A protein has these predicted regions:
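As written
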Residues: 102-108
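His-Asp phosphorelay/catalytic-motif detector in bacterial-type signaling
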Residues: 4, 29-30, 51-55, 80-86
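Receiver (REC) domain active-site loop signature in two-component systems and cognate sites
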Residues: 62
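Conserved acidic segment of CheY-like receiver
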Residues: 4-16, 20-24
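C-terminal output helix
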Residues: 115-126
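Acidic, metal-coordinating helix/loop segments flanking the phosphotransfer/catalytic sites
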Residues: 21, 35-55
């Protein structure tokens, strides 16, 4: 986990992308915000880049490669796993099966996306603040 690295958002809904973009702009984080509408594109980026992201926010229901499948591929890839990138689901539904499956893949959080802008902003602020306070194995001096 690189606290100065980009925040990756994997979300196929353009309205949700726009809302999240507005939220992050209003919170004025210094991290670059990178959006992907497809899990496959996000995986290609994560595998090919030397940049270590700060955190990944992922939807679950996406075409081709779901958020759950993407998490599995990241977790199976030793190089990506060793980067200790927090992987969080930020999605519209919390079906029991999804929550259980997610935690069985060692995710670091499962959040239901609020419908209210202010509530989204507060939850993002809480999540980012939490991870900014955490220590990761890669950055212990």
């Amino acid at each position: 986990m690189n606290k100065g690295g980009p925040i990756i958002i994997i979300e196929d809904d353009l309205d949700d992308q726009e809302t999240l973009s507005d939220v992050f702009k209003s919170l004025d984080y210094k991290n670059e915000i990178i959006f992907f509408s497809e899990g496959e594109k996000a995986l290609e980026y994560l595998i090919s880049t030397n940049v270590e992201p700060f955190i990944i926010f992922s939807d679950i229901n996406m075409p081709r490669l779901s958020g759950m499948e993407l998490r599995g591929k990241i977790h199976e890839n030793e190089d990506l796993r060793l980067k200790s990138i927090p992987y969080l689901f930020f999605t519209t539904s919390a079906e029991q099966k999804h929550v259980v499956d997610a935690y069985s893949k060692s995710i670091q959080g499962f959040f239901v996306k609020p419908t209210d802008y202010t509530a989204i902003k507060e939850i993002i602020k809480t999540i980012v603040g939490y991870w900014q306070s955490c220590v990761s194995p890669n950055y212990i001096k």
